[in-house]
Curated annotation (Swiss-Prot):
Disulfide bonds: none annotated. HAMAP family: Thiourid_synth_D. This is Sulfurtransferase TusD. Its EC number is 2.8.1.-. It comes from Cronobacter sakazakii (strain ATCC BAA-894) (Enterobacter sakazakii). The gene is tusD. The active site is at C78 (cysteine persulfide intermediate). One of its GO terms (cellular component) is sulfurtransferase complex. Part of a sulfur-relay system required for 2-thiolation of 5-methylaminomethyl-2-thiouridine (mnm(5)s(2)U) at tRNA wobble positions. Accepts sulfur from TusA and transfers it in turn to TusE. The keyword Transferase applies.
Length: 128
């Protein structure tokens, strides 16, 4: 089956993003296809490369990047939600007059159209 995940919880503070990552890994291990992960609302914090967990904590931001690097899973973050929460890439930082970017490599700013397209082309959309 072909899946898309939507993550609305931040990297830390709730279980949503961690559960989504575990689910994503389980899908791939079982031979399913994971087309994309769409981060929305507080979920965009999963793409903030300035997140720096303690040395004894799991680094969820880098784990999402690793999932992308190893499996080619597209990691989309809602551009409107991201800008409201201070997460941006170089292009948006320049356009908004911000001093710098903090989008973790492997993630891409996208509109809700990316989620709509994924929902149309996948068998299941699972929200965390």
């Amino acid at each position: 089956m072909r899946f898309t995940l939507m993550v609305t919880g931040p990297a830390y503070g709730t279980q949503q993003a961690s559960s989504a990552l575990q689910f994503a890994k389980a899908l791939l291990a079982e031979g399913h296809s994971l087309e994309s992960v769409f981060f929305y609302r507080e979920g965009v914090y999963n793409a903030n490369q300035f997140t720096s967990p303690a040395s004894d904590e799991f680094d969820l931001v880098r784990a999402w990047q690793q999932l992308h690097d190893e499996n080619g899973v597209a990691l989309h973050i809602c551009v409107a939600a991201a800008l409201r929460r201070g997460v941006t890439d170089e292009n948006e930082a320049r356009a908004q007059g911000l001093p710098g970017a903090n989008l973790q490599p492997g993630f891409q700013l996208s509109g809700l159209g990316a989620l709509a397209e994924a929902a149309l082309t996948c068998d299941r959309v699972v929200e965390f």
